[in-house]
Amino acid sequence: LARQGGRTEDEAALRAAWYLRRDGDDPGPGGRILKAWRHLGERAAMLSKDWTINLSALFEVRFGDALDDVVMQAAKLAVGQGSAVAAAAEVAAASLHFVPQCEPLALWLADMVLAHRLKWPMAAPLIASQIRRGDLRAAGKAGAADEVWPKACALAYARAAASAADLYVDLVRRADRLLVAAPKLRGKDADTMVAILIMEDAQPAGAGKTASDRSSRRLFERLVALGAVRELTGRPTFRLYGL
């Protein structure tokens, strides 16, 4: 998504922008895209009554009839009957028609509608990583009878599901390894850090609630030595650790 929006940040740069910022700092344009997709995976994001105000802020789309129309369509499709993927494709096309300047909004709503239709407790970011830019451009032009976009959307979700399943298997294996190593840890905040590493993509080795900065660094060095986590940056300073 960052690249589609003309940004140059890769995964490592986005991770650094998010996890190394201070509370209240602007994570930058790329970091704001990451923020929108982190919000997608939160349980609170499922509440359609908050979509208009939250999406306006997340995607920097001004309030107006266009955004209202898209959100109303999404809320309607979220509780409808029929194919979940077809509903996701429909809301994405509607979003690109009404708010053509914001492709990420269309993909966010597609995943959200899909999650509602499938009765998931929260949404998962799926289509954005698999949809092709050319197919996305066609979506805003697709008519009601056009089959190009629905098929492209279905294929993207099929690829996304396979990729998500592979990632799940890998993360479960890595999380199990961390949990096996956890009883061997003796540092302050060790239990808290293990919980954070299970829940978050990355964690800086900074001071915790009771542990010093030095103690925290030793904890992460121990976890790396045990093969429980990886150092993700390759830098000697401002390091990040994760599964």
Set out the residue ranges of the language-model regions.
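FIC/Doc superfamily catalytic core
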Residues: 1-243
